[in-house]
């Protein structure tokens, strides 16, 4: 029983140290959670004339390793995303 508790605590500690699983929105429509990845330019999100978001990816973003900021379009400018 104690061994199971120890293993469970070990995995919980490893999960907390590595960070909780991150989510990203490949369609660039939701709030993208920040992670601690490199600052390589990964993609570009733009808003076209009819108001739809277009997301162009320049590199592969590993699942859970994609960061950016909340996509807000007050002046319809380009918003860069990083991975």
Swiss-Prot record:
Transmembrane segments: none annotated. Keywords: Disulfide bond, Neurotoxin, Secreted, Signal, Toxin. The keyword Disulfide bond applies. GO terms for cellular component: extracellular region. It is found in: Secreted. Expressed by the venom duct. The keyword Flavoprotein does not apply. Residues 1-18 form the signal peptide. Residues 19-26 form a propeptide. Contain 4 disulfide bonds. GO terms for molecular function: toxin activity. The cysteine framework is XXII (C-C-C-C-C-C-C-C). Probable neurotoxin. Belongs to the conotoxin E superfamily. This is Conotoxin Im22.1. It comes from Conus imperialis (Imperial cone).
């Amino acid at each position: 029983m104690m061994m199971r508790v120890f293993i469970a605590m070990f995995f919980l500690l490893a999960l907390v140290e590595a960070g909780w699983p991150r989510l990203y929105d490949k369609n660039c429509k939701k709030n993208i959670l920040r992670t601690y990845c490199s600052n390589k330019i990964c993609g570009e999100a733009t808003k076209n004339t009819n108001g739809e978001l277009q997301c162009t990816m320049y590199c592969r973003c590993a699942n859970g390793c994609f960061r950016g900021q909340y996509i807000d379009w007050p002046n319809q400018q380009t918003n860069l995303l990083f991975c």
